[in-house]
């Protein structure tokens, strides 16, 4: 897509607006970090409780480190595998709205996706996006194509971004909030690449 296309899409993701974007692990519903109205809309689409945790999509480790505290070991680990299909659980900074972090642990899941289209959109927006996988209420499998998303919930979205590179699967989740890194879920990201 041309650069101007991303600028137009970035402008569309205004207050209260939700988009579906392809990531390196499937499609996610996303909105701006500080947009409670849009976040509530995502909860409504997916029928999620207030306890559901969301992931922050960042365009770089630099942006990620403004939102979370990470020690040198964790930073080196994240740097070695990002961008890529990994979600890192870290202690949130004050930059993260409290409604997004874990209520007792004050942690948040962050990732730097590797697909170019989402990366370009993140750069144009200039801030992280909050997201969750596009799984419809009562279903176990995520929606896996743009046309399927358009058919089911297209009227509730500002736009659908599909760069055709999406692979459906889970991210590998690594908790870096404690003393030692801990793999919470093994997904598309190689655990051996983490050096664990």
Where are these regions (language model features)?
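Active-site-adjacent structural elements in enzyme catalytic cores
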Residues: 1-196
């Amino acid at each position: 897509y041309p650069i101007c296309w991303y600028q137009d899409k970035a402008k569309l993701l205004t207050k209260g607006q939700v988009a579906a974007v392809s990531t390196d692990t499937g499609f996610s519903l996303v909105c701006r970090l500080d947009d409670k109205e849009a976040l509530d809309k995502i909860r409504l689409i997916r029928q999620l409780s207030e306890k559901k945790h969301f992931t922050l999509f960042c365009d770089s480790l630099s942006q990620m480190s403004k939102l979370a505290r990470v020690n040198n070991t964790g930073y080196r680990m994240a740097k070695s595998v990002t961008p890529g299909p990994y979600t890192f659980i870290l202690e949130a900074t004050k930059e993260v709205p409290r409604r997004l972090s874990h209520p007792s642990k004050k942690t948040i899941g962050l990732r730097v996706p590797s697909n170019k289209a989402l990366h370009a959109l993140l750069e144009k927006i200039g801030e992280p996006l909050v997201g969750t996988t596009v799984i419809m209420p009562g279903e176990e499998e995520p929606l896996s194509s743009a046309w399927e998303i358009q058919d089911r919930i297209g009227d509730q979205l500002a736009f659908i971004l599909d760069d055709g590179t999406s692979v459906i699967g889970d991210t590998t989740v690594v908790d870096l909030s404690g003393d030692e890194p801990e793999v919470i879920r093994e997904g598309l990201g190689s655990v051996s690449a983490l050096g664990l």
